[in-house]
Amino acid sequence: MADTTGRIPLWLIGTVTGILVIGLIGVFFYGSYSGLGSSL
């Protein structure tokens, strides 16, 4: 990861974290819906 500013902006951390959380929840519910279960 290229860190040019010396410090990662807080909004960037929040955005990435939000995307990851939504992605994990989406994958979990999609897996449960398609019958894969909790294969994580």
Curated annotation (Swiss-Prot):
Membrane-spanning segments: 8-28
Location of this chain's protein in the cell: Plastid, Chloroplast thylakoid membrane
Topology of the protein relative to the lipid bilayer: Single-pass membrane protein
Domain of life per record: Eukaryota
Principal subcellular localisation of the protein: plastid
GO cellular component terms attached to this protein's record: chloroplast thylakoid membrane; photosystem II; photosystem II reaction center
Biological process per Gene Ontology, one example term: photosynthesis
SUPFAM superfamilies: Photosystem II reaction center protein J, PsbJ
Keywords: Chloroplast, Membrane, Photosynthesis, Photosystem II, Plastid, Reaction center, Thylakoid, Transmembrane, Transmembrane helix
Protein function: One of the components of the core complex of photosystem II (PSII). PSII is a light-driven water:plastoquinone oxidoreductase that uses light energy to abstract electrons from H(2)O, generating O(2) and a proton gradient subsequently used for ATP formation. It consists of a core antenna complex that captures photons, and an electron transfer chain that converts photonic excitation into a charge separation.
PANTHER family in alphabetical order: PHOTOSYSTEM II REACTION CENTER PROTEIN J (PTHR34812:SF3)
Subunit details: PSII is composed of 1 copy each of membrane proteins PsbA, PsbB, PsbC, PsbD, PsbE, PsbF, PsbH, PsbI, PsbJ, PsbK, PsbL, PsbM, PsbT, PsbX, PsbY, PsbZ, Psb30/Ycf12, at least 3 peripheral proteins of the oxygen-evolving complex and a large number of cofactors. It forms dimeric complexes.
The family this protein is said to belong to: Belongs to the PsbJ family.
Name assigned to this protein: Photosystem II reaction center protein J
Organism (species): Sorghum bicolor (Sorghum)
Lineage: Eukaryota, Viridiplantae, Streptophyta, Embryophyta, Tracheophyta
